Design a protein with these regions (language model features):
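Hydrophobic transmembrane architecture of multi-pass small-molecule transporters
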Residues: 35, 258-317
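Transmembrane core module of solute transporters
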Residues: 20-21, 26-32, 58-60, 71-72, ...
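Membrane-embedded alpha-helical segments of multi-pass transporters/permeases
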Residues: 37-42, 100-103, 203-206, 272, ...
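Interfacial helix-cap and linker-helix signal at transmembrane-aqueous boundaries
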Residues: 12-20, 74, 149-150, 181-182, ...
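Hydrophobic alpha-helical segments of secondary membrane carriers
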Residues: 1, 130, 254-258
């Protein structure tokens, strides 16, 4: 799933969007979910219940409210102009309150929902920091790739999906090789190599223009995905290398939560910057859109757009 998801996801999502509608990107998860649940019920052995272990419902509820409100604020913040909207302010207050009660309760109860002893392990704490960096930087960049390919480069939805899938192909190749490479190289060497590849490809993307070749995009995406594969497996291995067995369940869930929240924060930041940049550039260009601009008096412009009418100005805008 980790390897095939990044390959099949963009291609399948693009095909469903182009053939049916974007709603089917979500509907398609229903049959896969049913198959997964059925497989768990049929093939997975039942584990023994630990009756002496109580579930921390208060900590779970407080954390769910904190994370849920934060995610909602991050998703809707750009649409509602962030702190100018009372909805975003209320969501952030609810999120802060949820996190406050979660931490206050966790430090005072005997069996908290999350064992904070996991952060005392240096390898795990370091891996967590790297996960935050990857979530903020890489996944936010991936979120901008699809609108870049479609809006700026003019590729159809299906072509954009196939281009995004090449990154997953690079990750697939790296994960097939990394287990054998770990027999010859240290985990930190592979992680450093993977981060270097990702940094190089991201830097190369800053020089892309509207006429960038498809071959360049494919090579860049494959190398970037290969770098991610070199980082992901050794980083996960290093995170749990010295973590006690009874803390590994908490560690696994914490890595997943932190990566998802970090990616949401990163995506919100880049979308906010994109929106502000678009607004600023639009304002500069709009200053030159008037009937007295000589460039707009050319026959190929005046034949299709009349700037003296509201419809013409709206079309130009």
């Amino acid at each position: 799933g980790v390897m095939m998801g990044p390959i099949m996801g963009p291609s399948l999502g693009a095909w469903l969007t182009e053939t049916y509608s974007w709603h089917w990107v979500f509907f398609v998860n229903l049959p896969f979910g049913i198959i997964t649940v059925a497989g768990l019920l049929i093939f997975m052995d039942e584990t023994k219940l630990n009756t002496g272990l109580q579930f921390d419902w208060f900590g779970f509820t407080a954390l769910a409210i904190g994370i849920g409100s934060l995610q909602l604020a991050l998703d809707r913040g750009e649409q509602l102009d962030w702190l100018e909207s009372w909805e975003i302010v209320i969501e952030l207050i609810v999120s802060g309150t949820g996190f406050y009660y979660f931490f206050a309760h966790s430090f005072t109860t005997k069996r908290p929902f999350v064992q904070f002893a996991i952060f005392k392990d240096r390898n795990f704490a370091t891996a967590l920091i790297f996960m935050v960096v990857i979530g903020v930087v890489l996944f936010s960049t991936m979120a901008l790739a699809s609108p870049l390919f479609q809006n700026a480069y003019g590729y159809p939805i299906l072509t954009a999906g196939l281009l995004l899938a090449t990154r997953g192909g690079g990750t697939f190749m790296a994960m097939m090789m990394v287990s054998r490479l770990m027999s010859y190289f240290e985990a930190r060497t592979l992680i450093a190599t993977g981060l270097s590849l990702m940094a190089f490809t991201l830097y190369e993307m800053t020089g892309w223009t509207a006429d960038v070749a498809v071959q360049t995009i494919v090579i860049n995406s494959v190398v970037q995905g290969f770098g991610l594969g070199l980082v992901f497996v050794p980083l996960s291995t290093a995170a749990f290398m010295t973590l006690p067995n009874h803390l590994r369940t908490d560690g696994t869930s914490m890595l997943t939560v932190v990566r998802n929240v970090a990616s949401s924060i990163g995506i919100s930041i880049v979308i906010a910057q994109l929106t502000r940049g678009t607004t600023r550039v639009h304002a500069v260009l709009a200053e030159h859109i008037n009937p007295f601009n000589n460039a707009l008096q050319m026959p190929n412009v005046t034949s299709s757009i009349n700037l003296n009418t509201d419809m013409g100005r709206a079309t130009m805008d």
